């Protein structure tokens, strides 16, 4: 969901920047991390419950 992604991205980007990493590095890292997290959560929801 878009709001969750934005929250994940904003938090990640701030933490990444605070560590002294560059904007583009953080943008790519956080975009990937948060996209993967989003996909993972969706997959968890689709798994059949045994």
Curated annotation (Swiss-Prot):
Pfam families assigned to the protein according to its UniProt record, in alphabetical order: Ole_e_6
Cystine connections: 8-34, 12-30, 16-26
GO molecular function annotations of the record: IgG binding
Tissue specificity comment: Expressed in pollen.
Keywords: Allergen, Disulfide bond
InterPro entries associated with the record: Pollen_allergen_ole-e-6, Pollen_allergen_ole-e-6_sf
Protein name: Major pollen allergen Ole e 6
Source organism of this protein record: Olea europaea
